Every structure is written in structure tokens, then in C-alpha cells.
Amino acid sequence: MAGHRPSNHFCPLPGSGGGGPRGPMPLRVDTLTWLSTQAAPGRVMVWPAVRPGICPGPDVWRIPLGPLPHEFRGWIAPCRPRLGASEAGDWLRRPSEGALPGPYIALRSIPKLPPPEDISGILKELQQLAKELRQKRLSLGYSQADVGIAVGALFGKVLSQTTICRFEAQQLSVANMWKLRPLLKKWLKEVEAENLLGLCKMEMILQQSGKWRRASRERRIGNSLEKFFQRCPKPTPQQISHIAGCLQLQKDVVRVWFYNRSKMGSRPTNDASPREIVGTAGPPCPGAPVCFHLGLGLPVDIPHYTRLYSAGVAHSSAPATTLGLLRF
């Protein structure tokens, strides 16, 4: 019978009627046959290739493998729709009634633990924890993202800013909040105990995370400026002001970046580089109205403005040093 795969035919478990135990019922056998229950209580299916063994426990039945009222076909035991208690008593015995000769199947029923009847205490504890977390975070000056990173630095599981936000607002399910409870309680304990080693480690991680965020923002700003440059290599002062407002930069930074980028010519920039070289300011460009996208918004038409400088003239007073983008 090797090679046969179990199908979805089930057989009712004798003695497990409507009032019987519910939940998972692991079964062990002393032959290469395995009976395991599925989602529906009181149903068993035969599985192959399990080593001999008997489940310990007080609730055990021994079923003889001799002449059973079921006919095994392959690995499946088709059963009659119903089996009364009197019929089951003829071939189902308790171990206390005496050992059965020959091979047998030992069945152990493990009832499913009932859910807690009253979860009001759990809800109160989670509400109190969320309140304490928010108060302690604000008193220390940490952001929600800092708390998530600090939890990861201390306990190896980084939590997102959204997760911390929803936990404080109690917008997560009770099950998810209960899973996060140990980590957040440990973090509060570390902070309140003023563990110097743990706090130093946490501060180092937060500083490194701040550097990563700044570098990511610089890359994003550099890519946006490069897109603006491809549409208008020499923007007017009004265009520079608009770009600076969109990217939340100073106008001088944008103006210097465009002039320095024009000096680089058509050399492609490296998107992975977190910095762009900036230098002195250059003349704005004349010409017809220019249409280009500002960030993620709609295309904006910038009208033509009169030329203020002659070609090739730059501010001599502007510093010619190499600067990076401003840090935020």
C-alpha cells in the first residue's frame, strides 16, 4: 500500500458525539498507519508512514486492528454515517479494562483550551500600556519611528512607525496588541531602569538611522533636481523660487545647484550618490514659456521673463567652494 496518498474521506470518531471533546486530537499507532483529526471535530483521516508509538495521557482508547466494522481500502477508512455508543462499546475499550492482544491503535483526545471568558482585564492592561508608551515617548522626545527602531536595536524586532502609531491609538486588534505587549513593556522597562549600556546602544542606532534618513532625503532631492534640470537647464529666478518651495529648500541652494549642474554639461549623474556638487550661481535662461512637472503635481507653465544677465556672466561674489546639500 506504499505510495498511496490520503484523500479527503473521513470517518466519525466513535464516542465523540455532539458533547465530546473538541479541538486537535493527535493520534499515535503501533503500525505504519496514522490517524489525525482535521478541522471538523470528531472526524479522523488515515495517514501513512508514522513510526510505532503510543500517546500518553488519561483519555486513551485502544482500538484493535483485527476485525473492525470498517474496511480499509488503501489508507482510507470509509465509515458508516453513524455509530451508536452501544455499537462502539463492542470493539472500543478503555485501557483499564485489560490489555488487548495483538496490535492496536491508541487514540488520545486533547480538548481545546477554551478562550478567556472575560477579556476586560486584558483590554484595560493594553489601554494602560498604550497610554504609558505615549507619555514616556513624548517625555523623552522620541518619535514613533525612533521607538520602533529602538525596539529592534534592543530586542531584534524592528517595529514600523505605523505600528507604534496604531498601538498608541489602540487601532490594532487585541491579538496583535497582545503580541506587541512584551516588546513594548521591555522597552519601557529598559528606559525606566536607565540601563546605560542599552540606552547607549539605542542612541547609536537612532543616530545611524537619522543618517540613513538624511542620506535618503538627499538622494530624493537630488533626483528631483535632476528631473527639473532635464526640463529646464537654466531656470529663471521665479522658477527657482517655485522649485525651492516644492522641495523645501533654500533658493540659494537650488540656484547654486543648477549653475553647477550646467557646468557639468551632459555628464549623467549617479542616482545612488547622496550628494550633488554645487558652486556659484549662473544666469537664468531666456526663451519661450517652459512647461515641466513640479514633483507629483500637474505640469505648470512658467511664463517668459526678461533676461537679466548676459550669457556667460556669473556672480563673482558667490563662493566657489564645493558644498553638499543642506542637512535637515
Curated annotation (Swiss-Prot):
Q: What would be an example GO MF term here? A: RNA polymerase II cis-regulatory region sequence-specific DNA binding
Q: What is its main location?
A: nucleus
Q: Where is this region: Disordered?
A: 1-25
In terms of Gene3D superfamilies, this protein maps to: Homeodomain-like, lambda repressor-like DNA-binding domains
Q: What Gene Ontology terms describe where this protein resides (cellular component)? A: chromatin; nucleus
**In which tissues or organs does this protein occur?**
Expressed in skeletal and cardiac muscles, brain, heart and lung. Little or no detectable expression found in pancreas, kidney, liver or placenta.
Q: What is the annotated localization of this protein?
A: Nucleus
What this protein is reported to do is described as: Transcription factor that binds preferentially to the octamer motif (5'-ATGTTAAT-3'). May exert a regulatory function in meiotic events that are required for terminal differentiation of male germ cell.
Q: Which family does it belong to?
A: Belongs to the POU transcription factor family. Class-5 subfamily.
The protein in question is named POU domain, class 5, transcription factor 2
Q: Which gene encodes it?
A: POU5F2
